[in-house]
């Protein structure tokens, strides 16, 4: 199970990173939206493995982070599906998002609160890794930097920023996945590879 979770730490971000290649005039589009939504399944599976490791050192903080992460993944799926439906129904010029203004309390719960929770969860994850010394400082720095820059790439749709953020995430998560994979081969009693 731990090896599958380690692999998922790479697969999720790579699928997510493919989405900007399919954006259509600054919109997620059908394919980009599906890639965003689908990426959350392996990514959250891998991050649950990280939660298990973090809760040994900081149970309350790890639990709160997991809650924030799940809310963020809800927002990620919602925005991915919004892009899918916007593309499928031919809605352009942000008309699809503008229609959510007609449903303020519901769109707040589905999009506007959970959406920012994803980069916030990534920042908290990086901070937790640093605090618990569960990863090298450069991994945590890449994750935190990507979390801060994420809104520029995804909300403002600055494609070059989205690509840079995705590369930062893939590099950091690939290293974390490699370390998680190696921990599955360690003899019992050895520290968790930090």
Predicted regions and their residues:
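Hydrophobic, aromatic-enriched alpha-helical segments typical of multi-pass transmembrane helices
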Residues: 1-194
